[in-house]
């Protein structure tokens, strides 16, 4: 037996002996004193893990029985066992003593009532104190994040507010009393882990009772009450209107309440027929109507409300809600704390004072504006800046209605004058309400009547479409999740990055926190007439308790609808009752699903076999993959997928070809499945611009992106177009990372293979470009005579293909001096022929399009005739150079045969060294839209800061994915060297 068990067993015997010796029992306070007098120590509550005496005795049901007394006190009596039954019988036969035990205060009667010669006022016990509003606000703030176990409450409170929860200073003796005092906002549920504290939700009895409302057909429906006691309400759960809905708009709610009370009191004959339960329900409804009319704003001191109104009235053009507390402090020299009033923040405080204040949101403003409710808005302000309903207070204004007069809110004003197309400004809370866009096939009068009987939240999405993600650049390396698979030619991916997947997770967490509140969920319930194909809403999946954005695809029947998940790509069936309006703030994030097809593959037969689909599903699994963007065909992304989780990288198209499920072709076949049905293109719209969502994770340097097949080439760009090599099929890119800096793995190797283009030339003067615009390059007149243009060779799928330009032991073709001189003359002739075009394009704001990227190296003023091409001297020079110059000097020169019309490179180590000393930067040109080009200036000088980005070369055909490919997730350190794709003129 452990020490704790021994102490507990001994304590059980001592408590039983104390209570058996007392005929009338003891209160918990008396038990503590009796135990202290008998044993000499206090009850060992902390040793046994208890917080109060009541918790201790409740854990001993076989020793102590708890019985409440008529005066409000609690009496503890012993339950005798076999050995103490005789003593209990003897004590029960004793005569009751009316003396006060243990020198209690004189004048206090005994615990139990008995025959007494003197009649005394019965003792009602200690009245539990009221929990202060600031404490209740802190408890709501703590439990709004997540429920907390009672055993972890102190740690959670200290972690949240930086101090322990001292309930004694508020007049409470235990947490049991605190929870009883906060029972209107906190509920306790018993779980296996212990007592779980959570924010109180609507009671099931309140769900069953509702205000009767008459629909068009005369049927009755119920709506759950959204009622809270004064000064206590859950976070983000606005108090709804508690008046009877009426078919006619001219009937006022106060008259209905008074009529209901009059009918309840006067019509005695009809009421007598009702049973007892119905009477209580009717009386309870009357009380709730009065309480809900008062609202949370009724708990605020009228003097404070007058001060707030005085402060706001000083700003007729509106006061920013973030400056309200400061202006109040400046004007009245006192601080205003919303938490002391029972509110979480100033927004919730202002929302509760809708009877004296109104809130507006204007386009272009980042904050809410507060106005005096009695002041008319300025006409100039209304004409210039429109108020938008969608960005109302996060906790919409609560109704602060008196019993004498109840004014209609903006929601009630919505159906009135609906025939007018222009916007109408309502009185409370003075929000501009746009007319509802009628659904096809819905009668306008029926819609108006239905809306009169249903509350549509002002920030609910009605006719908005989600935006799609902006297209990705070719050869972009991304981390992806394959979310939904139909076939290798028809599946959906989701990008794994800081700007996409993490934002989606944050939004889903916020949606779960918001819609899990029963009051909010009931308020945003979608009526039947809004359930139409194409409507954007949200739904909760009962299996995982998460809320998802969905788009209604089609209505299956009276109870079910088919919905499309724009963030994951799948289509599912849900109940109509589970659909909810989507809040406007949850539409900012674009749809995350991207329709894709596996690049360069097609099925062996006409359609994909089931074995091929199963094999593709096994390859994808539930793990992040690396994807390489190839191109877009009919708006469908064709992408290469690779699994880098094992030691050997696995390309999916290779596996499907090896297994005999697919044929690898060097073109992308349009997807038949997406051609028949593409819900994402049907229900979403393209991103309006990069200002909506910019995928900085993908390293897109340009502000605009156009596909090659969709691009139109202007005549000017055609004239400026430089001739390039014949198109060679681009192979799979190498995914080994290369760093430009001190941490290069091989200092004698640079991941750029220089190759002389046929007659091609590029500007050698370096320039920088910003995201906002691009500067024109210099004309060829200002260029040195000896500017060499290097182009990267394009990779091939053939594994036997080897680049002709190799370094560090690789093959280098050396030609005779005569051949070099002759080819050099040819290069000069070609350069002089192309010079007029370059001069004509120098005045254009953008560079001409290039089909390959060029590296310009500024050379020194040395003669080419005196230079000698010596491979041995080059190798010696490579070893002696610093990192910056070594990276440039070791750039291999791809020298092809003269039959291929490729120029050769002639230089010496001295000239190379001088060239690199004169310029330490490389400008990488990438083909962009309408002739515009981006450059990437790589500073290679040692005194400059080392680049922290990883640049991926396209040097070999079948290089495996290395460790750098696993960094393609959310580090922003992985970038492609710009790839080039031939465009049709």
Swiss-Prot record:
Lineage, opening ranks: Eukaryota, Metazoa, Chordata, Craniata, Vertebrata
Swiss-Prot/TrEMBL keywords: Cytoplasm, Developmental protein, Differentiation, Phosphoprotein, Repeat, Spermatogenesis
Gene Ontology annotations of biological process type: P granule organization; spermatid development; transposable element silencing by piRNA-mediated DNA methylation
Alphabetized InterPro entries for the sequence: LOTUS-like (IPR041966), OST-HTH/LOTUS_dom (IPR025605), SNase_OB-fold_sf (IPR035437), TDRD5_LOTUS_2 (IPR037982), Tudor (IPR002999), Tudor_domain_containing (IPR050621)
Chain intervals with Polar residues compositional bias: 823-845, 904-915
This protein's record includes keyword Cytoplasm: yes
Name the UniProt record assigns to this protein: Tudor domain-containing protein 5
Organism: Canis lupus familiaris (Dog)
Similarity comment: family membership: Belongs to the TDRD5 family.
Subcellular location(s) per record: Cytoplasm
GO CC terms in record: chromatoid body; pi-body
Pfam families assigned: OST-HTH, TUDOR
SUPFAM superfamilies: Tudor/PWWP/MBT (SSF63748)
Gene coding for it: TDRD5
Comp. bias intervals (Low complexity): 107-116
PANTHER family tied to this protein: TUDOR DOMAIN CONTAINING PROTEIN, TUDOR DOMAIN-CONTAINING PROTEIN 5
Residue numbers spanned by region Disordered: 98-119, 818-846, 889-915
Ranges for domain HTH OST-type: 7-80, 127-202, 300-374
Domain Tudor: 530-589
Function: Required during spermiogenesis to participate in the repression transposable elements and prevent their mobilization, which is essential for the germline integrity. Probably acts via the piRNA metabolic process, which mediates the repression of transposable elements during meiosis by forming complexes composed of piRNAs and Piwi proteins and govern the methylation and subsequent repression of transposons. Required for chromatoid body (CB) assembly.
Modified residues (Phosphoserine): 897
PROSITE patterns reported in the protein's UniProt record: HTH_OST, TUDOR
């Amino acid at each position: 037996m452990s020490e704790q068990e021994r102490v507990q067993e001994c304590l059980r015997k001592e408590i039983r002996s104390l209570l058996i010796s007392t005929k009338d029992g003891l209160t918990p306070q008396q038990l503590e004193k009796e135990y202290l007098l008998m044993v000499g120590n206090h009850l060992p509550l902390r040793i046994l893990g208890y917080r109060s005496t009541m918790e201790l005795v409740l854990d001993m049901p076989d020793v102590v029985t708890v019985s409440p007394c008529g005066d409000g006190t609690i009496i503890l009596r012993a339950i005798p066992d076999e050995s103490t039954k005789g003593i209990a019988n003897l004590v029960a036969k004793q005569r009751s003593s009316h003396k006060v035990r243990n020198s209690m205060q004189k004048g206090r009667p005994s615990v139990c009532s008995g025959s007494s010669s003197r009649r005394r006022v019965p003792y009602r016990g200690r009245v539990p104190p009221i929990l202060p509003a600031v404490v209740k606000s802190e408890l709501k703030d703590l439990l709004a994040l997540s429920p907390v176990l009672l055993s972890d409450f102190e740690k959670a409170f200290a972690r949240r507010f930086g101090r322990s929860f001292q309930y004694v200073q508020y007049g409470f003796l235990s947490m049991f009393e605190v929870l009883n005092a906060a029972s209107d906002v906190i509920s306790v549920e018993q779980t296996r882990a212990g007592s779980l504290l959570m924010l109180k939700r609507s009671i099931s009895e309140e769900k069953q009772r509702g205000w009767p409302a008459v629909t068009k057909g005369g049927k009755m429906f119920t709506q759950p009450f959204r009622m809270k006691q004064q000064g206590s309400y859950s976070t983000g759960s606005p108090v709804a209107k508690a008046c009877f809905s009426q078919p006619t708009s001219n009937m006022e709610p106060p008259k209905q309440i008074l009529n209901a009370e009059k009918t309840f009191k006067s019509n005695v004959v009809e009421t007598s027929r009702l049973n007892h339960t119905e009477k209580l329900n009717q009386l309870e409804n009357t009380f709730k109507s009065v309480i809900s009319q008062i609202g949370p704003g009724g708990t605020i001191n009228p003097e404070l409300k007058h001060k707030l109104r005085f402060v706001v009235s000083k700003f007729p053009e509106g006061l920013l809600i973030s400056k309200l507390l400061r202006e109040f402090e400046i004007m009245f020299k006192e601080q205003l704390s919303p938490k002391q009033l029972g509110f979480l923040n100033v927004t919730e405080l202002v929302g509760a004072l809708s009877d004296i204040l109104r809130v507006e949101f204007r386009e272009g403003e980042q904050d809410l504006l507060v106005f005096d409710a009695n002041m008319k808005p300025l006409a100039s302000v209304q004409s210039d800046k429109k108020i938008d309903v969608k960005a109302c207070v996060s906790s919409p204004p609560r109704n602060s209605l008196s019993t004498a007069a109840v004014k209609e809110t903006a929601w009630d004003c919505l159906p009135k004058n609906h025939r007018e197309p222009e916007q109408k400004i309502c009185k409370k809370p003075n929000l501009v309400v746009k007319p509802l866009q009628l659904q096809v096939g819905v009668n306008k009068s029926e819609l108006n009547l239905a809306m009169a009987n249903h509350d549509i939240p002002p920030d609910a999405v009605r006719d908005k479409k989600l935006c799609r993600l902006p297209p990705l650049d070719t050869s972009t390396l991304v981390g992806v999740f394959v979310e939904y698979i139909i076939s290798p030619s028809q599946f959906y991916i989701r990008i794994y990055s800081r700007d996409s997947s993490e934002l989606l997770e944050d939004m889903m967490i916020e949606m779960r926190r918001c819609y899990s509140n029963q009051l909010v969920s009931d308020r945003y319930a979608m009526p039947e007439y809004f359930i139409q194909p194409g409507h954007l809403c949200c739904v909760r999946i009962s299996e995982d308790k998460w809320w998802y954005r969905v788009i209604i695809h089609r209505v299956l029947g009276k109870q079910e609808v088919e919905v499309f998940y724009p963030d994951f790509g799948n289509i599912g069936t849900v109940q109509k009752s589970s659909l909810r309006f989507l809040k406007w703030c949850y539409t900012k994030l674009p749809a995350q699903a991207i329709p894709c097809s596996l690049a360069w593959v097609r099925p062996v037969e006409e359609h994909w076999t089931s074995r091929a689909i199963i094999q593709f599903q096994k390859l994808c699994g539930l793990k992040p993959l690396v994807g390489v963007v190839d191109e877009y065909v009919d708006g469908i992304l064709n992408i290469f997928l690779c699994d880098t989780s094992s030691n050997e990288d696995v390309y999916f198209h290779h596996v499907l070809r090896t297994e005999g499920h697919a044929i690898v072709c060097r073109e992308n076949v349009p997807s038949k499945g997406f051609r028949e049905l593409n819900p994402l293109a049907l229900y979403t719209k393209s991103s309006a611009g990069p200002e909506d969502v910019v995928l900085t994770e993908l390293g897109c340097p340009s502000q605009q992106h156009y596909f090659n097949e969709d691009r139109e080439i202007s005549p000017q760009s055609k004239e400026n177009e430089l001739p390039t090599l014949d198109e060679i099929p681009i192979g799979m890119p190498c995914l080994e990372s290369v760093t430009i800096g001190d941490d290069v793995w091989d200092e004698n190797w640079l991941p750029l293979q220089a190759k002389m283009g046929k007659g091609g030339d590029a500007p050698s003067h370096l320039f920088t470009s910003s995201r906002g615009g691009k500067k024109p390059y210099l004309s060829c007149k200002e260029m040195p005579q000896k500017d060499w243009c290097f182009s990267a060779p394009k990779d091939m799928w053939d594994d036997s293909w080897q680049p002709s330009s190799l370094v560090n032991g690789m093959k280098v073709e050396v030609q005779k001096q005569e051949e070099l001189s002759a080819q050099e003359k040819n290069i000069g002739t070609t350069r002089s022929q192309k010079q007029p075009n370059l001069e004509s394009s120098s005045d254009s704001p953008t560079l001409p399009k290039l089909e390959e990227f060029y590296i310009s190296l500024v050379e020194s003023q040395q003669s080419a005739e005196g230079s000698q091409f010596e491979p041995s001297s080059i190798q010696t020079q490579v070893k002696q150079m610093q990192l910056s110059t070594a990276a440039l000097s070791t750039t291999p020169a791809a020298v092809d045969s003269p039959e291929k019309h490729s120029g050769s490179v002639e230089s010496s180590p001295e000239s190379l060294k001088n060239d690199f000393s004169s310029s330490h930067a490389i400008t990488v040109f990438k083909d962009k839209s309408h002739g515009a080009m981006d450059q990437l200036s790589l500073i290679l000088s040692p005194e400059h800061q080392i680049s922290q980005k990883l640049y991926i070369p396209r040097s070999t055909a079948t290089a495996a994915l290395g460790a750098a490919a696993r960094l393609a997730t959310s580090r922003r350190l992985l970038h492609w060297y710009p790839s080039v794709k031939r465009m049709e003129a």
